[in-house]
C-alpha cells in the first residue's frame, strides 16, 4: 500500500487510494477474519509451479504460498527443504498433502499440464495421495495466482479460502 499511497499523493487521487488500496485491503481482512473465527483445522498443502519442462514445489516465500500461509494452511514444502530443491514423489507421498495447488507459468499452460501428467500423475502412487483421492487437486488461475492480482487480491484470497475450507464457501461468496 505504501507505493500506491505515494502515487496517489503525487496525482492527488485519494479516491483511487481508497478504491484500489483500502477497499482491497478490507476485502482481504474480511476473508482472513472469517477463516480465523471458523477455527477449522489447518490443512496440509502442496503448492506446485509447473512449466513445460518441469515443476517446482513452492514455499511460503512465494506469493501464493504466502496467501496459503495467511489462510492457515501448512505448506509441506516449508518443512521439507528437499521438496524445494528436488521435487520427489517419495517426499510428496510421505507428507501426503490434503490439498494440492498448481499454478502454471510460461506461454503454454497445456505443455505444463502435459509435463505434470507424464512425470507426476503417471506415477501409480499419485492416485493414492489424499488430495487426489478426495478431489482436492486444484489448477489455479494464472491471473490470480501467478501474476499479482492487483485489484483482485480479495478475489484471490476468497478463492483459496473456499478451496481450503469448503464449509465456508457460502460465507465467502457473501463477501464478494
Language-model segments: residues:
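Proline-aspartate-enriched helix->loop->beta-strand connector
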Residues: 89-102
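Extracytoplasmic substrate-binding proteins
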Residues: 1-54, 77, 132-176
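Extracytoplasmic/secreted cell-surface and envelope-processing proteins
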Residues: 55-57, 85, 109-113, 148-149
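A ligand-binding cleft/hinge motif common to bilobed small-molecule-binding domains
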Residues: 102-120
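Extracellular/periplasmic catalytic domains that process cell-envelope and extracellular macromolecules
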Residues: 38-41, 69, 93-95, 129-133
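Solvent-exposed coil/turn segments that connect beta secondary-structure elements
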Residues: 50-51, 97, 105-107, 142
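Alpha-helical, coiled-coil/dimerization segments enriched in small aliphatic residues
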Residues: 56-85
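Alpha-helical scaffolding within the catalytic cores
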Residues: 26, 33, 84-91, 119-128
Amino acid at each position: 500500500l505504501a507505493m500506491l499511497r505515494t502515487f496517489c499523493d503525487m496525482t492527488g487521487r485519494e479516491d483511487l487510494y481508497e478504491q484500489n488500496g483500502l477497499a482491497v485491503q478490507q476485502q482481504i481482512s474480511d476473508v482472513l477474519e472469517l477463516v480465523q473465527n471458523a477455527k477449522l483445522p489447518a490443512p496440509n498443502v502442496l503448492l506446485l509451479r509447473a512449466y513445460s519442462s518441469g515443476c517446482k514445489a513452492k514455499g511460503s516465500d512465494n506469493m501464493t504460498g504466502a496467501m496459503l500461509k495467511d489462510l492457515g494452511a501448512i505448506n509441506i514444502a516449508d518443512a521439507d527443504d528437499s521438496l524445494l530443491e528436488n521435487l520427489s514423489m517419495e517426499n510428496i507421498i510421505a507428507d501426503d498433502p490434503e490439498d494440492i495447488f498448481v499454478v502454471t507459468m510460461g506461454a503454454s499452460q497445456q505443455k505444463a499440464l502435459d509435463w505434470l501428467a507424464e512425470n507426476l500423475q503417471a506415477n501409480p502412487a499419485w492416485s493414492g495421495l489424499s488430495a487426489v483421492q478426495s478431489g482436492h487437486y486444484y489448477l489455479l488461475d494464472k491471473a490470480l495466482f501467478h501474476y499479482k492480482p492487483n485489484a483482485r487480491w480479495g478475489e484471490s484470497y476468497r478463492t483459496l479460502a473456499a478451496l481450503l475450507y469448503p464449509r465456508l464457501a457460502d460465507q465467502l461468496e457473501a463477501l464478494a
